[in-house]
Regions:
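C-terminal motif of bacterial Sec signal peptides marking the signal peptidase cleavage site
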Residues: 20-23
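Conserved N-terminal structural module of periplasmic/extracytoplasmic solute-binding proteins
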Residues: 25-99, 111-113, 145, 159, ...
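Helix-loop-helix "hinge/cap" segment bordering the ligand-binding cleft or interdomain interface
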Residues: 193, 224, 495-602, 667-673, ...
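Hinge/lid segment of periplasmic solute-binding proteins
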Residues: 457-510, 526-530, 641-648
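Short, solvent-exposed loop/beta-turn-alpha elements that line the ligand-binding surface or hinge
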Residues: 473-486, 564-586, 636, 646-656, ...
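Periplasmic-binding protein-like
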Residues: 540, 681-710
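Extracytoplasmic/periplasmic substrate-binding proteins
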Residues: 586, 590-677, 698
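C-terminal capping/gating helix-and-loop segments adjacent to ligand/active sites or protein-protein/ligand interfaces
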Residues: 725-803
Length: 811
């Protein structure tokens, strides 16, 4: 199987998501008459605000049904429930639930929370012609629900059947057995009355055996046809199941939605022109209308129109309305400012009067229960909303943990609230760093937010050296529940600037490189010269790193590793003309080639395991990011003992720390105690015990690591341990992970993996410093060396000159 490869930049970044009332100003700010650091005090008070109200529909519930469509009175949901057990006579199941039979059900919930099951609904009857075959199994699911004008329902129901045609003498555990595996996939278009009773049912007239046909989403067009969307096709079916029309799409379909005027809009990317546009379906002609509309590059999921706009969409944490007439989008509000977690938001709907609604909720994996809230957002006069003192906050690409932390703070604090701006909204299709540039420009102009989210691209050391950030050590030392000795000292040391700690960091990851100990030695850390000596032991033509790591990737990685060796924001000193930096340039250019990311395809031959086995690759990347998700078996990959060596560097071990959930406070913040109450959350054991990365608290880390090493074993329905063919207990898998080609099963962390992880953490002292302004200077000038126009020494001098001017201008 072939897979398109990612670009260099993407590859690097991948290495490094009852009622209450909240309000957000129409311009995206809550606004407060209190003077705020980081905001323009003359900014006018908004005329309107958007307020969110929450109705609790489920709490600690076993109901796993998901909302499908909203009406004026409530909403329809679809779930699955166990309805039987098909365990063959005399057969012991291999695992609990192996032969359980499930069927879909439909409920209607009014907005008071009253749930009514559509008792007259009966799943479509299965074709039993193959029911006597070996391993026969059938499953039902409802792919979507729509409400007709008369209140009846249109649903698309899927029936998946599978069995084996293997003769009786072929054993079920043999490889040959699976050559006889057969399956059928059928879709039915059904109309139901309000009780769920069937009005009509028809099998879709489509080649459902093709992988190209599946129901990702469907809507009803003006004629009542069910317009079905898959990622590459649009197919409309009449109520009798016959094909009404099909619209070929040479590209990728992202979303479909009903526009304010009732027509259907289709958001698609044309692969030949790479245009990202909204196309309108002409349901009478069965084609796209001749006019298409330019859409913002981040409008991936359309929301049907109502109120003042033809359609809507959410991008990041912001909600937008889009006008066909002007072909422009207007930001209406931030979900976070309304205390709505957009990561949990589903089935957003806009009514004719402009009221926005949706559902939030989640699954508690410990209690094994579900929660569900109905949220409505309405536009009200700004003065009608109670105001709090505002703390401004800036971030790039607001992840799940940041969003949840801000919402939790705002909901629980009756005096202060955090107003978060996601600067990724300023990125463009041509410049994915525009938001970061804007944020940095504002900060250097004196418009510093009270709280700043820190990631690998944030010029954290520059801000700290300039005195823009608050040292958090005094706050930690004064906090009775926190003790700096509880945290990994090398991680905190890597985050220090001139002895001060300027960010509250909840977690981290380790980026390193691994090689066979017989080749690279058994001691972590090496210089460039030692790297070349090891590479000389490998077969001719062997490359140092994984497939796709060209000179630009290596240059950026090594620069991020040793950035602090070549520049000092505190003194303004630069050392890019040093012999060490010349060696860095030469190291990056060792393969003397650029990788064609646009046309490259990743195959089995290009995996690290295959290339190492064939002597084409000496090292492989090691990314340690969780105590509970250790999938690397490096000894198996190399077929020999390994060393977590790191990248070449002139001193120390070339491992890098990447921060997770890391936040800084402005030194000019007017309400520092309030800001600290937010920041300290990320340093608490209670917060870090649930993170999905390496916690900075050592006690929490050891607890997570110990838990990850506990091996659980599969049991039969009677509670007895199941055994494999060798009579050994079968360990329970913790999940699976893919490298883009192969999929690996993950089990409990082994002692060897735990020791490797502890050693990697202990050896790591350097913070990944992806200072984009400096990286851009270096990569732009290095191009002349890579192309052979200038020597490494000449380019190093040019970089020294430009970087020196820039750094001292920005100090």
């Amino acid at each position: 199987m072939k897979h398109k490869f990612r670009s260099c930049a993407a590859l690097l970044m991948a290495l490094c998501m009852v009622f209450s009332l909240a309000a957000c100003g129409q311009n995206g700010s809550t606004g407060s008459d209190t003077k705020q650091t980081g905001k323009n005090s003359s900014e006018p008070t908004p005329e309107f605000a958007y307020t969110a109200s929450f109705t609790k529909l489920r709490e600690n519930s076993k109901d796993n049904s998901q909302p499908q469509t909203v009406t004026a009175d409530g909403f329809y949901s679809v779930g699955n429930e166990k309805v039987g057990d098909n365990t063959p006579e005399g057969v012991t199941p291999d695992y609990e639930g192996q032969y359980d039979v499930y069927a879909p059900y439909i409920t209607f919930t009014d907005f008071s929370g009253k749930v009514t099951k559509l008792e007259s609904y009966v799943p479509v009857e299965e074709d039993q012609s193959n029911a006597d075959k070996r391993d026969y199994a059938g499953s039902h699911s409802i792919a979507g629900v729509a409400v007709n004008d008369d209140g009846s329902l249109t649903i698309i129901e899927n029936v998946y059947l599978s069995w084996s045609d293997a003769p009786a003498d072929v054993k079920s555990d043999s490889d040959e057995y699976y050559n006889y595996y057969q399956s059928e996939n059928r879709y039915y278009l059904r109309v139901l009355d309000k009780t769920g009773a069937e009005v009509s049912s028809a099998k879709l007239d489509a080649d459902t055996s093709s992988d190209d046909f599946y129901v990702s989403q469907f809507v009803l067009d003006e004629a009542g046809n069910a317009l079905v969307m898959s990622s590459i096709a649009l197919t409309a079916f009449a109520p009798d199941g016959s094909l009404a029309y099909a619209i070929p799409v040479d590209g990728y379909i992202y979303s479909i939605a009903t526009l304010r005027d009732g027509r259907i809009g289709v958001l698609a990317m044309d692969m030949s022109s790479h245009d990202f546009a909204l196309n309108i379906v002409d349901s009478k002609a069965g084609v796209f209308d001749s006019t298409s509309y330019t859409m913002p590059f981040d409008a991936y999921n359309l929301i049907s129109g109502g109120g003042d706009y033809d359609l809507y969409y959410t991008s990041g944490v912001n909600f937008y309305g889009y006008s066909l007439e002007t072909e422009t989008a207007e930001k209406l509000f931030s979900w976070i400012s309304c205390d709505v977690d957009s990561n949990e938001l589903a089935l957003v709907n806009v009514s004719d009067d402009g009221t926005i609604s949706g559902f939030t909720g989640g699954y508690d994996d410990k209690a094994e229960t579900y929660s569900l809230d109905y949220v409505t957002v309405a536009k009200v006069p700004y003065d009608s909303v109670p105001q709090k003192i505002s703390l401004s906050m800036a971030a790039m690409y607001v992840d799940n943990s940041t969003q949840k932390a801000v919402i939790d703070f705002n909901r629980s604090n009756d005096k202060y609230r955090i107003d978060l701006v996601d600067y990724s909204e300023y990125n463009t299709e041509d410049d994915y760093t525009a938001g970061l540039t804007k944020l940095n420009t504002e900060i250097m102009a004196g418009n510093m937010p009270d709280i700043l989210a820190i990631d690998t691209r944030t010029p954290y050391r520059q801000y700290a050296a300039k005195g823009l950030l608050e040292d958090l050590y005094p706050y930690i030392d004064a906090d009775s529940e926190l003790d700096r000795s509880d945290y990994f000292p090398n991680v905190f040391a890597a985050l220090e600037v001139n002895g001060g700690l300027y960010t509250a960091c909840a977690g981290f990851g380790i980026l390193s490189a691994v090689g066979a100990a017989s080749i690279v030695g058994d001691t972590p850390g090496w210089t460039y010269d030692e790297y070349y000596e090891a590479l000389a032991k490998m077969p001719e033509g062997c490359e140092g790193f994984d497939y796709g790591y060209d000179r630009n990737t290596l240059l950026t990685l090594c620069l991020a590793l040793d950035m602090d060796d070549y520049m000092d924001w505190s003194t303004g000193e630069c050392r890019f003309d040093s012999e060490d930096f010349v060696k860095l340039l030469e190291f990056a250019n060792q393969n003397n080639k650029d990788f064609d990311y646009e046309n490259a395809e990743h195959t089995e031959e290009d995996t690290a395991a295959n290339r190492i086995r064939e002597g084409k690759q000496m090292l492989t990347m090691a990314n340690f990011y969780s105590a509970d998700f250790m999938y690397n078996n490096f000894e198996q990959t190399f077929g020999a003992p390994v060393t977590i060596k790191g990248f070449p560097t002139m001193h120390g071990v070339g491992n890098m720390i990447t921060t997770q959930s890391s936040y800084a406070m402005s030194s000019t913040c007017q309400y520092k105690d309030a800001a600290w109450q937010f920041l300290r959350t990320f340093l608490t054991e209670d917060y870090q015990k649930d993170v999905f990365y390496l916690p900075t608290n050592m006690k929490v880390f050891e607890k997570q690591l110990a838990d990850s090493m506990v091996v659980e074993y599969e049991k039969d329905p009677n509670g007895n341990y199941m055994l494999d063919e060798n009579g050994e207990r079968i360990p329970v898998s913790k999940g699976m992970i893919s490298d883009g080609v192969n999929t690996y099963t993950i089990y409990a962390t082994t002692q060897e993996q735990a020791d490797q992880l502890r050693q990697a953490i202990a050896d790591t002292t350097k913070l990944m410093n992806y200072d984009m302004s400096i990286v851009n200077i270096v990569t732009e000038q290095a191009a002349a060396y890579f192309s052979g126009q200038k020597s490494a020494e000449e380019v190093a001098k040019l970089i020294q000159s430009k970087a020196n001017i820039y750094i001292n201008e920005q100090r």
